[in-house]
Amino acid sequence: MPWRRRRNRVSALEGGREEEAPPEAAAVPPALLTSPQQTEAAAERILLRGIFEIGRDSCDVVLSERALRWRPIQPERPAGDSKYDLLCKEEFIELKDIFSVKLKRRCSVKQQRSGTLLGITLFICLKKEQNKLKNSTLDLINLSEDHCDIWFRQFKKILAGFPNRPKSLKILLNPQSHKKEATQVYYEKVEPLLKLAGIKTDVTIMEYEGHALSLLKECELQGFDGGHRKPLFAIHWSVQRLFTGMQTLEPSVVCVGGDGSASEVAHALLLRAQKNAGMETDRILTPVRAQLPLGLIPAGSTNVLAHSLHGVPHVITATLHIIMGHVQLVDVCTFSTAGKLLRFGFSAMFGFGGRTLALAEKYRWMSPNQRRDFAVVKALAKLKAEDCEISFLPFNSSDDVQERRAQGSPKSDCNDQWQMIQGQFLNVSIMAIPCLCSVAPRGLAPNTRLNNGSMALIIARNTSRPEFIKHLKRYASVKNQFNFPFVETYTVEEVKVHPRNNTGGYNPEEEEDETASENCFPWNVDGDLMEVASEVHIRLHPRLISLYGGSMEEMIPK
C-alpha cells in the first residue's frame, strides 16, 4: 500500500550525539512523505548517494545540502503504469527537521554499546495538528560499517552546523508546581529528549519564592557555579571561551513550572541584562534586551505564558521548540510606581482579577482548581467596583513612530496624545500577549500578538452581577466576550491606573479575610500577587526577551 502523501514543514537548526539508536526505533514514520519539488532537488549540491533499506524497500538515497531524498529501486516496468509510478515516487525530509542521528545496532542483553550494526537512525521533528510537534524516527538500514560510518559522520557534520540550537541548558525546576508533578514531567518527558539531542543540562531545584531571581541575578551561568553544579562544565565553558568567543559562553535557561515560575525567571533574566548593561534597575525607561533565550516547559496549574507562546500547553511541543532552536522575540511590560520599577511582566489585572488572586493566595492549602473556583465565587459574591482614573497612550503603528521606538526613545517624551477615562470599574486588564488558557481557549486578549508592539487594554465598567458573570462566561465560548455595553477595549502603548479610593484596598475592619494589605490594591501580574498603594504605570517594550517557541509562521528566520 502506498504511503499517505503529506509534507511536514517545521523550522529547525542544530546538533546530535554519537550514541547508538535503540534497535526498536520505528521504521518509517507515516508523516514523512512525498514531495513534488524535483526542480529544487536538481539544483541542490549532492553530498552523498547510496543504497539503504527504508521500510521494506531498497532505496536509492541522496543526501544534498538541504534534504535527504529517497526513491524505491524497482525493476523496469512499462511507462504509464500508474501503480508503479506511485510506488516509485520520490520522498524526502528536510535536514533542518533532523535533531539527532545514531548508529542503530542489535545488542544482546549482556552487550551495552557494541553489537551488530543495522544502519543509521535519524530523529526528526514533525508538525502535528493544533500547533503540536512530535518526534519521530527514520531508519536507514545498511550492514556495511564503512558505508554507515561515512553517512553518520556527514550527518553529524551537518547537525553541528546549525548554530542557533542550544548546546547546554540551565534547568530551573519548581517541584511544587501543579500537585508537585513538575519533577516527574521533566525527568520522564523532557530530559530523555534533551539527552537524545545531545544537549548538556544542569538542574537547579527552585526551593523558595524568589530563588530563581536571586540565582540568575548573581550567578555566572557559564560555570554553573552554584548549588548542584558539575565542575566539568566550568572546564567546558572555559574551552569554549578560548575558541568560540563570548557569544556562546552562557547556556540557555529553561523553566519547568507554571506561570509564577515562568514570570519570575523572565523577570530575573531581564534584571540581569540591565545589570550587565550598567543600568540602574530601580528606574528604567528603555531597558536592554535579555541576552539569554528562555525556554518554558508547561508544568503548572496555569500555563498562560507557555500556552500563548506555543499555541498549546504541550510538554513535548515545548521541548522540541527548545531543541530545534525555534526562537520568538516577545514584547514585555514594565510595571512601575512613583518612577520606581516594580517588575517586568506580560499581563496584569486590576479589580476583580486582582482580588480573585489575592483571595486564592489565602487558601493555598486547597488544590489549585478548588482554590481558583472558591476565589472566583467569593469575589463574585463580594463584587465591588473601583473608582479609578485611567490614562493611556493609544498605539501608533506609523513607520516614523515605530522607528523612534526601535531606537529606544521613551514614548512619554514624544508628542503623543494621552487619553483619559474615569469612573467605577469592575476589572481592568492590560495584556501584551493573547493569554491563552483552558478557561479562555481564544485568549483573554485574542486580538493581541506576542510581538506586535502593542498592549490590549480591556475595561469592564460597573454593572450588575448577572451581566458581569455573562461577560466572564463568554471567555469559554466562541462568542465575542467584549460585545457588552459596559466593556471597552483599546490598543495601547502605555497605561497609567490611578485608584481614587481613599481607603485603598479592603478595610481590615470590614471583613476578616481582606484580600490586600491595608492601604494597598491587589494586582494580578502573570499570576503573581502584587500589592501597590498608588498609581501603577505600565509601559510596553517591544521584543525585549527571546523565548523558545511560537507558531511556525511567526518564528524568526534562520
UniProtKB/Swiss-Prot annotation:
Keyword Phosphoprotein: yes or no?
A: yes
Per the UniProt entry, what is one GO biological process?
A: sphingolipid biosynthetic process
What is the recorded phenotype of mutating residue 260 to D? Loss of nuclear localization; in isoform 2
Question: How is this chain modified after translation?
Answer: Phosphorylated on serine residues.
Q: Where is this motif: Nuclear localization signal 1?
A: 2-9
Q: State a GO cellular component annotated for this protein.
A: perinuclear region of cytoplasm
- Keyword Membrane, does the record have it? no
Question: Could you tell me which Pfam families the record lists for this protein?
Answer: CERK_C, DAGK_cat
Going by the UniProt record, its keywords in alphabetical order are: Cytoplasm, Disease variant, Endoplasmic reticulum, Golgi apparatus, Nucleus, Phosphoprotein, Retinitis pigmentosa
Which subcellular locations apply to this protein?
Cytoplasm; Nucleus, Nucleolus
Region (Disordered) residue ranges read: 1-36
Q: Where is this motif: Nuclear localization signal 2?
A: 102-106
Tissue specificity annotation: Isoform 1 and isoform 2 are expressed in adult retina, liver and pancreas as well as in fetal brain, lung and kidney. Isoform 3 is expressed in adult retina as well as in fetal lung and liver. Isoform 4 is expressed in adult retina, lung and kidney as well as in fetal lung and liver. Moderately expressed in retina, kidney, lung, testis, trachea, and pancreas. Weakly expressed in brain, placenta and liver.
Give every DAGKc domain span. Answer: 164-339
What are the disulphide bonds in this sequence?
none
Predominantly, its location class is cytoplasm
According to the UniProt entry, its GO molecular function terms are: lipid kinase activity; sphingolipid binding
Q: Which InterPro entries match?
A: ATP-NAD_kinase_N, CERK_C, Diacylglycerol_kinase_cat_dom, Lipid_Phosphate_FormReg, NAD/diacylglycerol_kinase_sf
Noted disease association is: Retinitis pigmentosa 26: A retinal dystrophy belonging to the group of pigmentary retinopathies. Retinitis pigmentosa is characterized by retinal pigment deposits visible on fundus examination and primary loss of rod photoreceptor cells followed by secondary loss of cone photoreceptors. Patients typically have night vision blindness and loss of midperipheral visual field. As their condition progresses, they lose their far peripheral visual field and eventually central vision as well.
Question: Do you know which PANTHER family this protein is assigned to?
Answer: CERAMIDE KINASE-LIKE PROTEIN, SPHINGOSINE KINASE
This chain's function reads:
Has no detectable ceramide-kinase activity. Overexpression of CERKL protects cells from apoptosis in oxidative stress conditions.
Q: What is this protein called?
A: Ceramide kinase-like protein
Q: Source species, please?
A: Homo sapiens (Human)
Q: Give the gene that encodes this protein.
A: CERKL
